[in-house]
Amino acid sequence: MQIIEGKLQLQGNERVAILTSRFNHIITDRLKEGAMDCFKRHGGDEDLLDIVLVPGAYELPLILDKLLESGKYDGVCVLGAIIRGGTPHFDYVSAEATKGIASAMLKYSMPVSFGVLTTDNIEQAIERAGSKAGNKGFEAMSTLIELLSLCQTLKG
């Protein structure tokens, strides 16, 4: 039996985008910082890292599709924060953002990591953006790095 898995180390020549929504920027800025830190710590070249900002989580799938279609990137780390409010808006935005991100990843067969928080309140979001529950932006970039490595291994 053979076990195949990715490594948590970049070769240093991977071009990566961090796609982040600006809405709830107090949270998404921290997620972005965590992702950038992870990229650098694991051998990424800052000159090969682009930060792409969109207004909100609903816009993430469209711009992810454009980034993958461009052929410029080896992978994309998608970050956002959708916080439940008093209306069904949360359900619609989180469902469509999630479906759209997964759809673009499969359409282009490219590594994409999902770091979009979906929380019931601001406290939960803060916990996941660098306090009690770690930084989910850092974790999303870690996932992307492993995916990049695994895809390279499977390519042969």
From Swiss-Prot:
Pfam families: DMRL_synthase (PF00885). The active site is at H89. It catalyses: (2S)-2-hydroxy-3-oxobutyl phosphate + 5-amino-6-(D-ribitylamino)uracil = 6,7-dimethyl-8-(1-D-ribityl)lumazine + phosphate + 2 H2O + H(+). Keywords: Riboflavin biosynthesis, Transferase. It comes from the Bacteria. GO terms for molecular function: 6,7-dimethyl-8-ribityllumazine synthase activity. GO terms for biological process: riboflavin biosynthetic process. Pathway: Cofactor biosynthesis; riboflavin biosynthesis; riboflavin from 2-hydroxy-3-oxobutyl phosphate and 5-amino-6-(D-ribitylamino)uracil: step 1/2. HAMAP family: Lumazine_synth. Belongs to the DMRL synthase family. Catalyzes the formation of 6,7-dimethyl-8-ribityllumazine by condensation of 5-amino-6-(D-ribitylamino)uracil with 3,4-dihydroxy-2-butanone 4-phosphate. This is the penultimate step in the biosynthesis of riboflavin. This is 6,7-dimethyl-8-ribityllumazine synthase. It comes from Helicobacter pylori (strain HPAG1). The gene is ribH.
